[in-house]
Amino acid sequence: TGLAYIDVKQLSKNDIVKGIDGENWIKTKRAKTHTRSNIPLLPIPADIIKGYEDHPQVVNSDKLLPILSNQKMNSYLKTIADNCGINKNLTYHLARHTFATTVTLTNGVPIESVSKMLGHKSLKTTQHYAKILDRKVSSDMSALKSILNKEEEKSRESKKQL
């Protein structure tokens, strides 16, 4: 979802609402900046939330998820990384960064949308936070090359017909 640890910890059942598209969205206010964060709920996070509906810490409260301390969450992420052979120090904040770069920007989500989902006050923050990956630049340039090649082909075909 790209939410910071504290924002996930504070999520309540009331933060899941129908968006203008009729789909479920997380609509909450960021603890750090007090700005709105509006995030369409993708299938995997939706399944995770559904999986905890009957958890004792969730059933009798307004909380959406049973959240441990940030330190404990990071410890679990480290264990998961080790078990998966990932040689990176996974942290909750790194997950937020990965959402911003790899999940959204690399897949063509405009930076303005990413900024809105992350709840940044300024686009400048998102530009600094979610630096464009070399893969994204390469992908964008490949798409541009393809367009230019098609235009060049059309131009050659037009000249042949004259």
Language-model features: locations:
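Short basic/aromatic active-site micro-motif
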Residues: 67-71, 87-107
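C-terminal secondary-structure termini that scaffold catalytic or DNA-interacting sites
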Residues: 56-59, 144-162
